[in-house]
Design a protein with these regions (language model features):
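Acidic catalytic motifs of isoprenoid enzymes
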Residues: 1-182, 189, 193-220, 224-228, ...
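Membrane-proximal bilayer-interacting regions
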Residues: 258, 262-264
Length: 293
């Protein structure tokens, strides 16, 4: 998940890169070197949403990934610290979810990743205990729904939506907190449903739970035309609600990046998933994106 290039000026692209690199440094500063390897565009967009309307001047330094030319980055701030902590907590609990979802042999890579991230998770959890508890509780409820083979996509999506929405409650300003809670709630709902569509073929083949299978009574690992139309309406609803919440706050210099993501980027990703042309690295296991903007 990232902004659509067609809507970004060169200045916006540089600013988004600086957030991406600033979050990478924040992950290391807050949670240790291992935390840097969960960095991806989803978490960078979270950092954008949490950032104040005015951006500081970026700094420039070499780093582990770019030891010669270096990169611009924003220095550690409250927004980057919050994004870093919440990203680590979310990544760690998603790894626990992946371990539970796979057999002993298949879960080895997730166990290894969780072990590497353990120290980072403990630091982040101590800094954000409320979000840590919320993440655990929502994923546990989601696991129970999966075990029950819940046929309601709304009930299943609700847990991940509420989980992301809980990040908004970490923000002190009451108005911004409410705006972010709504934006992140509907973003979480959208992510859950798009992931379900992206995983549908594999889940059906492996006999794994996928809410779309039970909601639409699918007899193969592909959506019927009627099911696809219904899912598109549900995804569009979440994007519209997210956009409505966005309009209630002035995001300043970040407005173009957010608009590009909400009004175009999400539609393009959803379209690619439904057409079978989108191949994402599994979110449940985290994973670092390369800067290709």
């Amino acid at each position: 998940m990232r902004p659509s290039l067609s809507r970004l000026s060169e200045e916006d692209k540089r600013r988004f890169h600086a957030v991406y690199c600033g979050l990478c440094r924040a992950l290391e500063a807050r949670c240790g070197t291992a935390a840097r390897f969960i960095l991806n565009y989803d978490f960078a967009f979270l950092a954008v949403l949490l950032s104040p309307p005015q951006a500081p001047e970026p700094l420039h330094r070499a780093c582990m990934a770019h030891p010669v030319a270096g990169r611009d980055y924003f220095p550690l701030s409250d927004a980057l610290a919050l994004a870093a902590d919440c990203s680590v907590i979310l990544a760690w609990w998603q790894l626990q979810d992946a371990i539970r979802d796979h057999d002993a042999a298949e879960s080895v890579k997730y166990r290894a990743a969780a072990a590497a991230l353990g120290r980072a998770y403990r630091r982040a959890g101590q800094a954000r205990p409320d979000f840590d508890r919320a993440t655990r509780d929502h994923l546990e409820r989601l696991a129970r729904l999966e075990e029950e083979r819940c046929p309601s996509i709304d009930r299943a999506a609700e847990e991940f939506a509420a989980l992301l929405g809980a990040i908004g409650r970490q923000v002190e300003d009451p108005v911004l907190s409410r705006v972010l809670e709504q934006m992140l709630y509907h973003l979480g709902r959208w992510i859950y449903l798009v992931d379900a569509a992206d995983d549908l073929k594999d889940d059906f083949a492996r006999g794994c739970y996928n809410p779309l299978i039970y909601r639409f009574g699918l007899t193969s690992g592909a959506l019927t035309d009627e099911a696809r139309e219904s899912l598109v309406l549900s995804l569009d609803h979440s994007i519209r609600r997210m956009a409505a919440a966005y309009e209630l706050w002035d995001f300043g210099v970040w407005s173009s990046i957010i608009q590009s993501t909400v009004y175009e980027g999400l539609f393009l990703v959803g379209k690619a998933v439904l057409e079978g042309t989108f191949h994402a690295a599994g979110r449940r296991s985290g994973g670092r994106d390369e800067e290709k903007l």
